[in-house]
């Protein structure tokens, strides 16, 4: 009889292991969320971190005693470029990240934030919380050469609307929105094609990877006006908004245009906001657990306090009645 009892006990334990630890009161084996973030020089990260909050006055990036404190979990993968974030999230079923709305494609799933899907309409009406300007920067201390000044005028003109529309960002025509809050409004300029290509050699473009689609469209559009290709007129190296700011500050030849995907207000830099963009929260396309996240849930995930998607899965109330 004792042998029979032992045999039955072994069978029961084997069955428990086969159907998973959850059924026996243990862990289901669900994998941890893979947090994918941008590096600290990214304007996209700055825009995301300064909005995502725990609801009690804490943000992923904030000033504490005059110092900037970053609260993204140390377990996060920190990547330099938008494309790298997209590739990692597309490969990893447990990943979550954030990218420019204009960069979203069908390899990723976009999650609503506070119940709102990012779009041109929800950015303009302010209902989508995580948004930022696309900023064009030049040196305020070094005069621009002829061709760089001409391209800047082109960027400030109505021509930029075509390129913004094509790249998925929201063109700004309102002079007040084109300037920093409280500063002199920046009007839309009129661009006239010159009789010949302005002098000055190649223009250097540095800065935000999120603005790549927009600036490449603008470069190509400008070059065509003078029968040239973009490669003939521009040198482009996009490594993040902070790199763009540094390049503009260090411009000694008047040939640098910087790009930032977060608001800019710094000494030594002239800037204007050419467009608005949403920062979209993305997960793997196969993720059926999460469709919506609140800012507070995002804070929990990106600080590492929430480690499983099941913790933020939307609960549906059962209609079964207890008899």
Give the residues covered by each predicted segment.
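C-terminal motif of bacterial Sec signal peptides marking the signal peptidase cleavage site
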Residues: 19-23
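Positively charged n-region of N-terminal signal peptides that target proteins for export
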Residues: 1-7
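Generic detector of N-terminal low-structure segments
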Residues: 7-9, 311
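Bacterial N-terminal signal peptides
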Residues: 9-18
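Exported/periplasmic ABC-transporter solute-binding proteins
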Residues: 25-323
């Amino acid at each position: 009889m004792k042998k029979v009892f032992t045999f039955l006990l072994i069978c029961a334990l084997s069955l428990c292991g086969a159907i998973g630890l959850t059924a026996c009161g243990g862990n289901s084996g669900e994998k941890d969320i893979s947090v994918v973030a941008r590096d600290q020089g990214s304007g996209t990260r700055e825009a995301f971190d300064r909005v995502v909050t725990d609801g009690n006055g804490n943000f992923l990036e904030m000033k504490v005693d005059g110092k900037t404190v970053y609260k993204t979990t140390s377990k996060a993968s920190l990547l330099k470029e938008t494309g790298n974030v997209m590739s990692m999230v597309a490969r990893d079923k447990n990943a979550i990240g954030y990218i420019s709305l204009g960069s979203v494609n069908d390899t990723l799933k976009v999650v609503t934030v506070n119940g709102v899907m990012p779009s041109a309409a929800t950015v303009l009406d302010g209902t989508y919380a995580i948004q930022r300007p696309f900023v064009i920067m030049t040196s305020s201390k070094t005069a621009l050469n002829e061709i760089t000044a001409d391209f800047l005028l082109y960027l400030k003109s109505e021509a930029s609307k075509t390129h913004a529309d094509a790249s998925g960002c929201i063109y700004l025509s309102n002079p007040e929105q084109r300037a920093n809050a409280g500063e002199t409004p920046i009007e839309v300029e009129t661009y006239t094609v010159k009789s010949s290509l302005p002098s000055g050699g190649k223009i250097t473009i540095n800065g935000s990877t999120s603005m790549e689609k927009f600036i490449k469209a603008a470069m190509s559009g400008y070059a065509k006006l003078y029968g040239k290709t973009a490669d003939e007129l521009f040198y482009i190296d996009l490594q993040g908004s902070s790199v763009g700011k540094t390049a503009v500050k260090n411009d000694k030849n008047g040939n640098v245009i910087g790009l930032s995907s977060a608001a800019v207000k710094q000494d030594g830099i002239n800037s204007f906001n050419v467009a608005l963009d949403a920062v979209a929260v993305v997960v793997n396309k196969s993720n059926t657990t999460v469709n919506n996240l609140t800012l507070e849930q995002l804070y929990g995930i990106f600080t590492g306090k929430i480690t499983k998607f099941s913790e933020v899965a939307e609960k549906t109330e059962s209609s079964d009645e207890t008899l």
